[in-house]
Amino acid sequence: MSDSKDQIYQDAKGAVGAFEFDERVAHVFTDMINRSVPGYAMMLEMIGVISRRYAQAGAHCYDLGCSLGASTLAIRSNLKHFNESDNKPKVIGVDNSAAMVERCRVNMERMPSVIPTEILCQDILSTPIENASIAVMNFTLQFIPLAQREDLLHRIAVNMKPGGAMVLSEKIEFADTDKQHTLFDLHHDFKRSRGYSDLEIAQKRSALENVLVPETIEAHIERLQRAGFSQAYLWFQCFNFVSFLAIK
């Protein structure tokens, strides 16, 4: 994984363009997400724990929006109990950023495994989902147009084996104004504690405007249930960042 420091928004810009997962972001993404998302390391660790329990022999484990492959590796490294199996699960990472996929493939090669792994450069809205026992979307759905989110989750649920699991991690908003302001401000305090300046925070926020569209916890759980998951739980929250577990 790249450990280059995120300085993309360090200098004042006359006009801040829309955020893109381009070469610049791919180069510093590991630093960016660890300094921007409170609890990120814990989420990755628990994705591994969840994968160990719910991955099924011969089934597919999807990381949809895999970026540099942190979640992909968390899944794969917890499938070692299948190493001697003749019916191993297959791990499939998907991302539509060529810059991310290129680096992700390198990261997979640096940590070889006998678990079959494929990294695809595709739009997850058109990626075939088949024979799934695990599906992870780690801060991905928030970048999908609102009108297309439910169809995507329904397609995942329909093509998931009984007893399979989905992990959905998202930045959220709150209907309660006081809670929204308090946790929003605490998130910015977290970013300052990780070395981001007020200018960097403001410019990144501007870049993400209308690109990252958050929703409430209730909206996410209700959608997961409508999509076809029998159970949907909030299992993690740190300020305005959460993760859900949905069971088929």
Curated annotation (Swiss-Prot):
Chain sites annotated for binding S-adenosyl-L-methionine: Y40, G65, C66, S67, D95, N96, D123, I124, N138, R205
Pfam families from the UniProt entry: Methyltransf_25 (PF13649)
GO terms, molecular function: carboxyl- or carbamoyltransferase activity; S-adenosyl-L-methionine binding
Key word Zinc present: no
Top enzyme class: transferase
Domain of life: Bacteria
Gene3D superfamilies to which the protein is assigned, alphabetical: Vaccinia Virus protein VP39
Catalytic activity, as annotated: prephenate + S-adenosyl-L-methionine = carboxy-S-adenosyl-L-methionine + 3-phenylpyruvate + H2O
Classification via InterPro entries: CmoA, Methyltransf_25, SAM-dependent_MTases_sf
One GO biological process term: tRNA wobble uridine modification
Keyword list, A-Z: S-adenosyl-L-methionine, Transferase
Enzyme Commission number: 2.1.3.-
PANTHER family: CARBOXY-S-ADENOSYL-L-METHIONINE SYNTHASE, TRANS-ACONITATE 2-METHYLTRANSFERASE-RELATED
Protein purpose: Catalyzes the conversion of S-adenosyl-L-methionine (SAM) to carboxy-S-adenosyl-L-methionine (Cx-SAM).
Entry's family note: Belongs to the class I-like SAM-binding methyltransferase superfamily. Cx-SAM synthase family.
The protein's name in its UniProt record: Carboxy-S-adenosyl-L-methionine synthase
Record gene name: cmoA
